[in-house]
């Protein structure tokens, strides 16, 4: 059972599920626990299914990388065929429940989130281009927009702008992690940004992108979450992230980049919590 739970990548998908909940609560202006429960269930199944499919599709990559070599498929804990069946069953259930329980528009965003991660990122671009993360990041937009559509019944400019807080955070976060494990990715033949453009250029790009994503989140907070509590929460997280980014840009060492990764990781969570409290 533990091996199958690992396939869901709980440390990854919980943030996407939180994004869907934040979109719903903000748009609805309150909580209908029946709707929220249905949203969380559909999001859990769809994101978990896409994560499990990623485990199946990338089992050869995982086996070649030290960081991922102890995952269930490389370790032989789950047969590939069973992992595939498990992933497709979860995915189908999540998308179906999205349409049946949430409605056409939220359901479409649930399906789009699955598609961008499982197909665009995992199947199409992961092994082909460093743009993989930029394209796959639209899964983050989709989960937020799905929740927002459920809460308000439609999508507006505020929804789109706020969804890009998730999108912009994703590449800075993933590329910071990829910087630490760049030799793993190079050995596995995966064209992540630090592998493609080199270490020094990668430090500049990732640090600047991290500052830009944090600045964007701060701007959204000023525009849409003008409460003192929201401003204080985001200010604390943003300050730490910007300071660590500047430190990484100056030092340009693996240790400094790892500090930036750790410091910036909570920023999106803080923002999404602030969205729910608005």
From Swiss-Prot:
Catalytic activity line of the entry: heme b + (2E,6E)-farnesyl diphosphate + H2O = Fe(II)-heme o + diphosphate
Record protein name field: Protoheme IX farnesyltransferase 1
Disulfide topology: none
A biological process term (GO) from this entry: heme O biosynthetic process
Keywords of this entry: Cell membrane, Heme biosynthesis, Membrane, Transferase, Transmembrane, Transmembrane helix
Residue ranges of the TM segments: 12-32, 33-53, 78-100, 105-124, 130-150, 157-177, 202-224, 228-250, 257-277
HAMAP family hit by this protein: CyoE_CtaB (MF_00154)
GO cellular component, one term: plasma membrane
Membrane topology: Multi-pass membrane protein
Extra remark: Carbon 2 of the heme B porphyrin ring is defined according to the Fischer nomenclature.
Predominant location category: membrane
UniProt-listed NCBIfam families: cyoE_ctaB
UniProt cross-references to Pfam families, sorted A to Z: UbiA
Function: Converts heme B (protoheme IX) to heme O by substitution of the vinyl group on carbon 2 of heme B porphyrin ring with a hydroxyethyl farnesyl side group.
Enzyme class: transferase
């Amino acid at each position: 059972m533990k091996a199958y739970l690992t396939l869901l990548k709980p440390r990854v998908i919980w943030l996407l599920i939180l994004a869907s909940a934040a979109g719903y609560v903000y748009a609805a202006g309150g909580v209908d626990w029946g709707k929220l429960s249905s949203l969380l269930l559909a999001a859990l199944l769809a994101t978990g299914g896409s994560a499990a499919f990623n485990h199946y599709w990338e089992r050869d990559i995982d086996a070649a990388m030290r960081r991922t070599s102890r995952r269930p498929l490389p370790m032989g804990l789950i047969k590939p065929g069973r992992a595939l069946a498990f992933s497709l069953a979860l995915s189908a259930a999540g998308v179906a429940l999205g349409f049946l329980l949430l409605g056409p528009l939220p359901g479409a965003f649930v399906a789009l989130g699955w598609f961008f991660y499982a197909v665009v990122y995992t199947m199409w671009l992961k092994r082909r281009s460093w743009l993989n993360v930029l394209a796959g990041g639209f899964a983050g937009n989709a989960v937020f927009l799905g929740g927002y559509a459920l809460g308000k019944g439609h999508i507006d400019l505020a929804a789109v702008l706020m969804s890009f807080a998730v999108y912009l955070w994703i590449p800075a976060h993933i590329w910071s992690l990829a910087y630490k494990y760049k030799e793993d990715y190079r050995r596995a033949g995966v064209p992540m940004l630090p592998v493609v453009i080199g270490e020094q250029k990668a430090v500049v790009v990732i640090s600047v992108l991290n500052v830009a994503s944090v600045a964007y989140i701060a701007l959204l907070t000023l525009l849409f979450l003008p409460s003192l509590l929201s401003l204080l929460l985001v200010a604390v997280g943003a300050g730490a992230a910007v300071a660590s980014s500047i430190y990484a840009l100056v030092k340009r060492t693996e240790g400094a980049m790892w500090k930036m990764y750790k410091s910036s990781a909570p920023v999106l969570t803080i923002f999404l919590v602030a969205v729910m409290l608005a």
